[in-house]
A protein has these predicted regions:
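Catalytic beta/alpha-barrel core
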Residues: 39-41, 55-69, 78-91, 102-113, ...
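Active-site-adjacent loop and "lid" segments of alpha/beta metabolic enzymes
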Residues: 35-43, 81-86, 142-149, 170-195, ...
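Short beta-strand segments at enzyme active-site cores
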Residues: 18-25, 59-64, 164-166, 200-207
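Glycine-rich, proline-tolerant flexible connector loops at the mouths of alpha/beta enzymes
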Residues: 1-2, 20-42, 207-217
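Alpha-helix-loop-beta-strand connector modules within alpha/beta enzyme cores
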Residues: 8-16, 37-61, 96-102, 152-164, ...
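A short alpha/beta connector and helix-capping loop motif
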Residues: 2, 6, 10, 70, ...
Length: 250
């Protein structure tokens, strides 16, 4: 399934001339319940991602959750991802930075946009400037998230690309009786709003049949939905880029 999904995503992005990085998790270490599906584990998971790179010919990224994973992951992945819940973990950020690989740091739901600067410093302190920041919503009371699009220009001021995670941003954390729920119907609205706000890329969870996904199904989009979003996003992106010189700076 991983190879087939990667190939279909590659083909969609190729048709639209949109750069694409394939993300899959070898371990979903932050699931709500002990009974929740976590993935194949680091050894088998990295083997699968290595196959995706070799056979589908795309770059790959995955989460690292502990410094013990960084070395092995860095030998396979083209980019390392720091999960939102771990974005303040100094040792993990330092270890990821020392690999020299690009590092995508997801902003925690509990973190203000301006407070991502220390996370950047922990990586640049390892002489690694290859950083991406990802906005994925902020806690809004219990079991809910809200997306403040001001976060995008705030985090862009430091000169690093900012990505918007449109699918995790519609998640309803732990609201599904032992799992997270979600409101996938709002993914297009948030994705297109983020592009209009100036984000440099979109993070989107995609599954052929979201209702059958073993993780995050309630906030996923299917392939047809993805293509619709990307087509619209590309048109908005063109407008935003054409008027970028007129955009006020913070």
């Amino acid at each position: 399934m991983c190879l087939a999904h990667a190939a279909q995503l590659r083909d969609i992005c190729s048709r639209l001339s949109i750069p694409f990085i394939f993300k899959a998790s070898y371990d979903k270490a932050n699931r709500t319940s002990l009974q929740s599906f976590r993935g194949p584990g680091i050894k088998k998971g990295l083997q699968i991602l290595r196959q995706v790179k070799a056979r589908v010919k795309v770059a790959v990224i995955s989460d690292v959750h502990d410094i013990s994973e960084v070395r092995a992951a860095g030998q396979v992945l083209d980019m390392l991802q720091i999960p939102a819940l771990l974005c303040r973990q100094t040792d993990l950020l330092v270890a990821a930075g020392r690999t020299g690989k690009p590092v995508n740091v997801k902003k925690g739901q509990f973190v203000a946009p301006l407070d991502m600067k220390p996370a950047i410093d922990k990586i640049t302190g390892q002489k690694n400037e290859r950083i991406i920041l990802t906005e994925r919503g902020s806690s809004f009371g219990y079991n809910n998230l809200v997306s403040d699009m001001r976060a995008i220009p705030i985090m862009k001021q430091w000169g690093y690309p900012v990505v918007f995670d449109a699918t995790h941003s519609v998640q309803l954390p732990s609201a599904g009786h032992g799992a997270s729920a979600g409101e996938a119907q709002f993914v297009p609205t948030l994705a297109l709003s983020a592009v209009a706000a100036g984000c440099d890329g979109l993070f989107l969870e995609v599954h052929a049949k979201p209702a059958q996904a073993l993780c995050d199904g309630p906030n996923m989009v299917d392939f047809a939905g993805l293509e619709r979003i990307l087509r619209q996003a590309k048109e908005i992106w063109k407008i935003v880029r054409s008027s970028a010189s007129a955009r006020p700076r913070l």
